Amino acid sequence: MCGEKSLLQEIDEVNIAMGLISLGARMQVLESETSLSRRRLLRLYKELRGCPPPKGMLPFSEDWFMSWEQNIHSSMFYNIYLYLKKTEQGRSIEMLMKTYRLYLEQCSTCSDEKPVLGLTRAWTLLRFIDCGIISRKACSVCGGGFIVTTEFIKNPFTCSLCSPPSRALKKSQVSNTGLLGTFAAPEIMTA
């Protein structure tokens, strides 16, 4: 086996690629996280999804994660990730997939509605954190861990659950289905 991948390693890579594709990963994520060729990944994607993968650049702005709703979802995802990283072993990509599945369970919405945080954005978030573009900070009111850009790391920090913007309150009045599905009513947030 001089320099060749074993069959078991290749099967493991295909399983990871299949898991990523089923969770909605873009080609750039697949290419970065597996050692399979682009050609094999394209073929696998088409077999699983029935269509070619979407084209275009990956999102590359930390600003998306700072918007109130996206920040809550991204922070929840990252807190789950930190917990799993502390309590379990495995490759970082396997940890990402497991975390994302748990995130989806917590944020179950209508089956036709996309989750706020897609897998590719979750992957990008972890890369931003590794690079130091984004970090985690405790809210000075509730003590919860939230992601912030490094320029906003200064004290004090108040999360958007403790101090929701008016559009968040309007959204909760339109569809009052709970804290994680959309957002809780104002009296629940202040209790």
UniProtKB/Swiss-Prot annotation:
Pfam families linked: FlhC (PF05280)
Cofactor note: Binds 1 zinc ion per subunit.
Keyword Transcription part of the UniProt annotation: yes
Domain of life: Bacteria
GO biological process, one term: positive regulation of DNA-templated transcription
Disulfide pattern: none
Gene Ontology MF: a single term: DNA binding
Chain sites annotated for binding Zn(2+): 139, 142, 159, 162
Principal location listed in the UniProt entry: cytoplasm
Localization in the cell: Cytoplasm
Keywords: Activator, Bacterial flagellum biogenesis, Cytoplasm, DNA-binding, Metal-binding, Transcription, Transcription regulation, Zinc
Oligomer status and interactors: Heterohexamer composed of two FlhC and four FlhD subunits. Each FlhC binds a FlhD dimer, forming a heterotrimer, and a hexamer assembles by dimerization of two heterotrimers.
Similarity remark: Belongs to the FlhC family.
Function: Functions in complex with FlhD as a master transcriptional regulator that regulates transcription of several flagellar and non-flagellar operons by binding to their promoter region. Activates expression of class 2 flagellar genes, including fliA, which is a flagellum-specific sigma factor that turns on the class 3 genes. Also regulates genes whose products function in a variety of physiological pathways.
Name recorded for this polypeptide: Flagellar transcriptional regulator FlhC
Originating organism: Enterobacter cloacae subsp. cloacae (strain ATCC 13047 / DSM 30054 / NBRC 13535 / NCTC 10005 / WDCM 00083 / NCDC 279-56)
Originating gene: flhC
